[in-house]
Regions:
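C-terminal ends and interior cores of transmembrane alpha-helices
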Residues: 82-99
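Cytoplasmic helix-loop-helix junction between adjacent transmembrane helices
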Residues: 108-144
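Helix-loop-helix hairpin linking two adjacent transmembrane segments in secondary transporters
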Residues: 133-134, 141-192
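Primarily marks hydrophobic transmembrane alpha-helices of the MFS/SLC 12-helix fold
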Residues: 74-77, 105
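Central cavity-lining transmembrane alpha-helices of secondary-active solute carriers
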Residues: 48-66, 254-259
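Extracytoplasmic gate region of multi-pass secondary transporters
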Residues: 28-30, 210-258
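Extracytoplasmic
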Residues: 9-43, 124, 230-235
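Juxtamembrane cytosolic amphipathic helices that cap and anchor the N-termini
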Residues: 3-16, 101, 206-219, 223
């Protein structure tokens, strides 16, 4: 079937979108101790990178409520992947180009966090709107791709570090940036249906007036913070706290958590 008419391609692009989000959230944490040794960062500065990533994604989630409906799902999801690609590429180059390594890292994190936040709010509704059979199975499989993407990030990156050396981490950062670039092109071609009829859509004021919304929001923030804390700091703890090698730390920490 044609890529422009088959919703199977839409679902596949969405799966790759969640893998992209896994790269955005979980690649840099594998390098926290490398950033510390190469760039002279403190643990407090590294912690702020994690906080910045999480906070910007939350902010983008809130701001996208109205923006997405006005602009459209396709341009927004394509832009999300371009932001992700730009951030991952910037991770490799900006710390050196700016002369201030920490400022470069923060700008890179800001870029890919914007992409990750948009992907988070766009991909599920896009799949939900696809006129396909077994939608429940497709949605369940969709959300599992974040975990499989997390595993892939750790395994592929660890294999690269073993073969090429941790000092060449900028190369694999650029290689990971190719994934969202390719998927941006993919999303520009696949069919995307409107998720909700505008006449039936709740206004932001109505949504904010529901107590259940605030309860679910609190649960999501707490769950997201816990997940980010575990996935992003497990490698550092295993390597520096337990004294194991980086390879064992990455496999036992973030990879084990993802599984």
């Amino acid at each position: 079937r044609s890529i422009r008419t088959s919703y199977t391609h839409t679902i596949l692009a969405s799966y790759l979108g969640y893998i992209t989000q896994a790269v955005v959230n979980n690649f840099a944490p594998l390098l926290f101790l490398t950033f510390r040794s190469q760039m002279g960062l403190t643990l407090e500065q590294i912690t702020l990178l994690t906080t910045l990533n999480f906070s910007i994604q939350l902010l983008v989630d809130f701001l996208s409520v109205k923006v997405v409906d006005r602009i459209g799902y396709r341009p927004c999801v394509v832009a999300a992947h371009l932001f992700s690609a730009a951030g991952l590429s910037a991770l490799a180059f900006l710390p050196q180009l700016l002369g201030n390594a920490y400022a470069g890292l923060m700008l890179a994190v800001t870029l890919y966090a914007m992409g990750g936040g948009l992907i988070e709010v766009l991909v599920s509704p896009i799949v939900e709107a696809c006129p396909t059979d077994k939608k429940e199975a497709a949605m369940s499989l969709l959300h599992s791709f974040y975990c499989w993407g997390h595993v892939a990030v750790v395994l592929v990156s660890t294999a690269f570090f073993q073969l090429a050396g941790i000092g060449n981490w900028r190369i694999i950062a650029c290689l990971w940036a190719a994934l969202p670039l390719v998927n941006a092109l993919y999303f520009s071609q696949v069919p995307i249906r409107r998720v909700v009829d505008p006449q039936r859509q709740l206004s932001v004021r109505s949504l904010f007036g529901q107590k259940l919304f605030w309860l679910l929001l609190l649960m999501m923030v707490c769950a997201g913070a816990a997940e980010q804390g575990m996935s992003q700091w497990a490698s550092v703890f295993a390597e520096s706290g337990l004294g194991v090698s980086k390879t064992i730390g990455d496999l036992a920490g973030p990879c084990g958590f993802a599984l």
